[in-house]
Amino acid sequence: MARVTVEDCIDKVENRFELVLLASHRARLIASGTPITVERDNDKNPVVALREIADETLTPEDLKEDFIQSLQKHVEVDEPEAEAVPALSSAPDAAQSDAMGDVQFDRMTEEDLLRGLEGLVPPAATDDDGE
């Protein structure tokens, strides 16, 4: 790449990292068949992309927007909701309280838990541990 081309581009895109991203994106577009806006002059696609940016035949803002759109997987569309979500009441209604009254949980004391754990048998030792 010609140093003159890169130095001409720095006037248009101040950040070198952003310049690399934009020029590489444009070079990929050229490789995929997008028509070029400057004479090729036997240059490769990255050099042509830098020359397009330097000659201002493409604006960096348009390239940046196109680059962002190429990376997006889902495009969000802001649409108003059809109807508002109903607000939750702070007090449960009668149907909910009846349903919750039918639910019972098993309660276990600490002694019952310890007795249950003592009744467990450890797994048998295997010969895989020591060869």
Curated annotation (Swiss-Prot):
Which organism is this protein's natural source? Beijerinckia indica subsp. indica (strain ATCC 9039 / DSM 1715 / NCIMB 8712)
Q: Where is the composition biased (Basic and acidic residues)?
A: 104-115
The answer to whether the entry has keyword Nucleotidyltransferase is yes
Provide the catalytic activity annotation. RNA(n) + a ribonucleoside 5'-triphosphate = RNA(n+1) + diphosphate
Q: Its family?
A: Belongs to the RNA polymerase subunit omega family.
* Gene name for this UniProt entry: rpoZ
Enzyme kind, highest EC tier: transferase
Sequence segments annotated as region (Disordered): 78-131
One cellular component term from this protein's GO annotations in UniProt: DNA-directed RNA polymerase complex
Q: What does this protein do?
A: Promotes RNA polymerase assembly. Latches the N- and C-terminal regions of the beta' subunit thereby facilitating its interaction with the beta and alpha subunits.
Q: Does the keyword DNA-binding apply?
A: no
E.C. number(s) listed in UniProt: 2.7.7.6
| One protein family per Pfam | RNA_pol_Rpb6
The annotated subunit structure for this chain is: The RNAP catalytic core consists of 2 alpha, 1 beta, 1 beta' and 1 omega subunit. When a sigma factor is associated with the core the holoenzyme is formed, which can initiate transcription.
Please give the name of this protein: DNA-directed RNA polymerase subunit omega
Q: Which domain of life is it from?
A: Bacteria
Q: What Gene Ontology terms describe what this protein does at the molecular function level?
A: DNA binding; DNA-directed RNA polymerase activity
Enumerate the UniProt keywords alphabetically: DNA-directed RNA polymerase, Nucleotidyltransferase, Transcription, Transferase
Query: Alphabetically, which GO biological process terms does the record hold?
Result: DNA-templated transcription
